[in-house]
Design a protein with these regions (language model features):
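Hydrophobic alpha-helical segments, chiefly the membrane-spanning helices
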Residues: 4-297
Length: 297
């Protein structure tokens, strides 16, 4: 029996692993399709009600590109896989900053504007500091373990609301709300105005894709972690984070190929802020998230 046990274990892993990979890939595809459908439907509704393109970009489009991270982290939190929920955000932000900016710079030099240096980058650093403070209960108040509590989640969501208010105020002050720039007008022209029934279908179908795909993706990631004998934190920081960052990577590379590499910086900063303030904020508000030594210090 002792000789047969390892053989049986390997046999089971060989059977389960392809299914887990199928769940992972299939779930990610459903998430991407769902995010695309939801974004198209919501953007069409926004255009129908004459909502400015800058508002659409800051809300609907930003949600669309970060929907994989949001879906996976919330699904993980609901399933009790806190390591995947947190590792997904931390790993995704690391992937965004190093991989996406690096790949974009390989295609074209990236010019950092003065506003980006003065506004967006400090906000991005602030979000990381806020997460560092919320996630280090043991170091700060001597608690027995590090937990992102419901209070921490609500605090992060408050920061997200402040960030949105600040962004809208800056856009209004600069005249972007009343007199959109040429590039914003072009973006607005590219938004398809769908019939009301089709917009509703896109939105509902997109939500269904996000929910079902999120469950499949988390189940696949957890199964792969068990099959490889590694922690869910490692899978969350690497495989899951890389998969959920694919929309940002594709957007940034396409922007670089179209000679607009500066879009990559805004894309990365916006995604990183959204991930920490909104994704982790929502996840921790639903259920407390316990941090391990891998996802924390």
């Amino acid at each position: 029996m002792k000789v047969l046990y390892p053989v049986c274990t390997i046999f089971v892993l060989k059977i389960d692993m392809p299914m887990d990979i199928l769940f992972l890939v299939g779930g990610l595809l459903l998430i991407l399709l769902g995010a695309n459908g939801l974004t198209d439907g919501a953007a069409s509704v926004a255009k129908r009600f004459h909502i400015p393109s800058i508002v659409i970009g800051l809300t609907i489009v930003a949600f669309g590109t970060s929907a994989p991270e949001l879906t996976v982290s919330i699904s993980s939190a609901l399933k009790g896989s806190a390591d995947i929920a947190i590792g997904n955000v931390v790993g995704s932000n690391t992937f965004n900053t190093l991989m996406i900016v690096g790949c974009t710079a390989l295609f074209a030099p990236i010019a950092i504007t003065r506003n980006t240096l003065k506004r967006e980058i400090p906000l991005c650093i602030l979000s990381s500091i806020a997460l560092l403070i919320c996630a280090n209960d043991v170091f700060l108040d001597g608690s027995g373990e590090n937990i992102l509590s419901i209070t921490d989640g609500l605090l992060l969501l408050c920061f997200f609301a402040i960030f949105l208010s600040y962004t809208f105020a800056i856009a209004k002050r600069d005249g972007s709300m009343k007199e959109p720039e040429k590039e914003h007008l072009q973006e607005e022209d590219e938004i398809r105005l769908l019939p009301a029934w089709k917009s509703a279908l896109y939105i509902l179908g997109g939500l269904a894709g996000l929910i079902i795909g999120g469950n499949f993706f988390v189940d696949g990631a957890s199964g792969i972690a068990r099959g490889l004998g590694v922690s869910e934190s490692i899978i969350g920081l690497t495989l899951v984070a890389g998969g959920t960052s694919l929309p940002e990577l594709a957007t940034s590379i396409v922007a670089a190929l179209k000679k607009n590499p500066e879009i990559a910086i805004g894309n990365v900063i916006g995604s990183n802020l959204f991930n920490i303030f909104f994704v982790l904020g929502c996840s921790a508000s639903i259920t407390p998230l316990r941090l391990t030594g891998i996802t924390n210090f």
